[in-house]
Amino acid sequence: MSKNKLSKGQQRRVNANHQRRLKTSKEKPDYDDNLFGEPDEGIVISRFGMHADVESADGDVHRCNIRRTIRSLVTGDRVVWRPGKPAAEGVNVKGIVEAVHERTSVLTRPDFYDGVKPIAANIDQIVIVSAILPELSLNIIDRYLVACETLQIEPIIVLNKIDLLDDEGMAFVNEQMDIYRNIGYRVLMVSSHTQDGLKPLEEALTGRISIFAGQSGVGKSSLLNALLGLQKEILTNDVSDNSGLGQHTTTAARLYHFPHGGDVIDSPGVREFGLWHLEPEQITQGFVEFHDYLGLCKYRDCKHDTDPGCAIQEAVEEGKIAETRFENYHRILESMAQVKTRKNFSDTDD
């Protein structure tokens, strides 16, 4: 992280926030300001309840308390923080997060109880990791792509475990990936085991903050370990040896630095994106190849299914839109309706 001193304007905002807390709060102040040093810039590399690990400009990590006035703080947030001063007994006081800078992007997921929940901030791109094992699921890739388009965060599709493919299998997978290449998505083929294809991926990650998403068992943790040069930092028991089924391996979102440049936020919250909180129109917009045909259907309320005069259906029949993508579009809509029905039933039951 480069050294960034607070500007005079930022200093004034910190002081103004402090004075406003003193004037408006009827409660006892949450922390004594005399316990802390001068404000500085930092980035949240992990969040634990009412504490956060903040990396300072010199690369050191500081455990910090969080002001009660800060309503939302997640990994990736850029913050103003103050270090704790040594206490009388010689024990260092935790630092404190004073303010959060405006986010350039925020990654969210729906929650049945809390609505939409932020899980990471200031993400430049989402790396969608898939693999031929446990299975190559284009439906899951399409779900991630809809989420990326809705969040307006750039996606990269990475197919892992290519070392397990023979020539025939590679030809088939390339044919499947051409569906995405042809509509403008970047696709990279890699192997975390043999490290084939890692160089182009490293280049795509350099200078950016990325987050890796993928179903359990695709080797996401092993791929991150290969890129980070780690063996134990991120656990690798991605798949059960007995069942072949994926296991969850990490519990808290954390930011790591790639040795070649760039950062990654590893979070269990993005193993799968729920889309049930979206409207059907948002799902439609999430399929980028549909855009040229929207508004051209015979009927304004066209469901893009069996409706007569559907421009999207005609494009599928003419080979301009991949039939697989069109089928997955309707699968996503159907699964959304089912989840919303269960949620509404649960709410009524309460």
From Swiss-Prot:
Cellular localization per UniProt: Cytoplasm
Biological process, per Gene Ontology: ribosomal small subunit biogenesis
Polar residues: bias regions: 1-17
GO cellular component: cytoplasm
Cofactor(s) needed for function: Zn(2+)
Positions with a binding annotation for GTP: N160, K161, I162, D163, G214, Q215, S216, G217, V218, G219, K220, S221, S222
MF terms in GO: GTP binding; GTPase activity; metal ion binding; rRNA binding
One Pfam assignment: RsgA_GTPase
Designated name of the protein: Small ribosomal subunit biogenesis GTPase RsgA
Originating organism: Escherichia coli O8 (strain IAI1)
